[in-house]
């Protein structure tokens, strides 16, 4: 949980928010240090977020999408005002280093963000899906390593991700040209390139950082979002699309409006 705590502290600092003002912590991880206490409780203990309710989400590579969707729902319901989302994965701990079909793909990492209520709508439409019948395509049993049918995961991703993005754009009555960046889960470059091609959108609007970190599962989208922010590539009023996909099999997308 060290990476999770570090990411959480940096997110709070960047947002200029006191940890005691956080009233909900959602941790997304498939590689917790403990069965219990959960990762979010460890984050609470080490950040001083003493007023927060804590729970974890296990949604593998779609973890950030699911966590952000949950935060949106809780805030809109009036239950919580400031939510800390932390995605942290130690993929090296469940990787078979003799299996080159997986060991060269994954990396360790953590990313975090603070979501709070606002008069303006930041997190807009959400589109989520799950197909448990395909669960055996990507598995990691207790105390065992990742087993993946890469070909089936590829076929699933390049079909379902464009579908969910198109559904999202229709919900918002928004054209793809209005989107600044499509920030996808960083699974592999071939998947991202194929999604861009199927959508008919230039690849330069699909940022990629795989060469630096590999596939960090739920952490990949918040890590990439932080990089774009640090590089001053995000501006107020930008529209962004996040899309995640992975073990479950599950997938989904969210449209975000960058507000001042």
What residue spans do the PLM features occupy?
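Short acidic, glycine/serine/threonine-rich loops at helix termini
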Residues: 36-38, 95-98, 251-255
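Conserved active-site "lid/cap" helical segment
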Residues: 1-23, 141-180, 191-200, 224, ...
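Condensing-enzyme catalytic core mediating Claisen C-C bond formation in acyl metabolism
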Residues: 91, 98-159, 163-166, 245, ...
